[in-house]
A protein has these predicted regions:
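Short juxtamembrane and helix-loop transition motifs at transmembrane-helix boundaries
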Residues: 1-6, 27-38, 64-67, 91-102, ...
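N-terminal topogenic module of multi-pass integral membrane proteins
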Residues: 1-55, 59
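C-terminal ends of transmembrane helices
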Residues: 52-62, 119-126, 188
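Extramembrane terminal tails and long inter-domain/linker segments of multi-pass membrane proteins
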Residues: 1-8, 21, 191-208
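Structural signature of hydrophobic alpha-helical transmembrane segments
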Residues: 36-48, 98-112, 172-175
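Hydrophobic/aromatic-rich structural module bridging two neighboring secondary-structure elements via a short loop
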Residues: 53-81
Length: 208
């Protein structure tokens, strides 16, 4: 029987997703130009999609159900989000030309993913504090985007992401979530390498 230790995949999965979320959030916070969407989607497919998918599948092997679920869902989010843009570009579906309508059809997408992120937050109560903060911020980010898109459609006064205050706020929440995710990944590598908590994660004490 092979007793060789299996590497911890949580580090690169968290870094990949956090980096992709950071780019998307910087775009929504109006730090990146709208023309950067191609870079964001390409990064999302590989760093935010493929990397967490590998981490999630490897977590199945180690018996870590929570990590497997979280990372595979993260990969699914980025694959789905990228194809929202790719399918019209490839001519496979009719593109939506009215910006407010395009935002409306994405509203349930972000809202439902926000529910999943909040469920992961609740499921992380026995994990470390950094992970809890990450999922909580992610849920708030997704819900703010959803409500911002709905408001844009309802008032019909937005033509771009830059016109939506809620989405701008969401962008900064997403920036925080992205940095927290990257911190979690880097801390996992560093702490495991040096066998001590160099970058604190806020471990939850075991319940009695």
């Amino acid at each position: 029987m092979n007793d060789q230790p299996v590497a911890n995949t949580t580090s690169f999965g968290a870094i990949g997703f956090g980096f992709s979320l950071l780019l998307l959030s910087l775009n929504m916070a109006q730090i990146l130009d709208s023309n950067a969407m191609g870079v964001i989607l390409a990064t999302g497919l590989f760093a935010g999609g493929l990397t967490p998918l590998i981490a999630g599948l490897w977590s199945l092997k180690t018996g870590n159900s929570f990590a497997a679920t979280a990372y595979i869902l993260a990969a699914t989010f980025w694959f789905s989000y990228a194809f929202i843009y790719f399918l019209p570009a490839l001519g496979l579906i009719t593109p939506v030309t009215e910006p407010a309508i395009a935002m409306l059809v994405q509203m349930p997408f972000f809202f439902l993913w926000g529910l999943l992120a909040f469920w992961l937050f609740l499921s992380s109560m026995k994990a470390n504090r950094v992970l809890q903060i990450n999922f909580f911020l992610l849920a708030i980010f997704l819900w703010l985007v959803a409500f911002g898109y709905f408001h844009a459609w309802e008032t019909w006064n937005a033509t771009t992401i830059a016109d939506i205050t809620l989405v701008w706020i969401a962008g900064w929440v997403g920036v925080a979530a992205g940095f927290v995710g990257i911190y979690y990944g880097l801390a996992s590598v560093l702490n495991e390498t040096y066998k001590r908590d160099i970058m604190p994660l806020g471990q939850v004490p075991p319940s009695t």
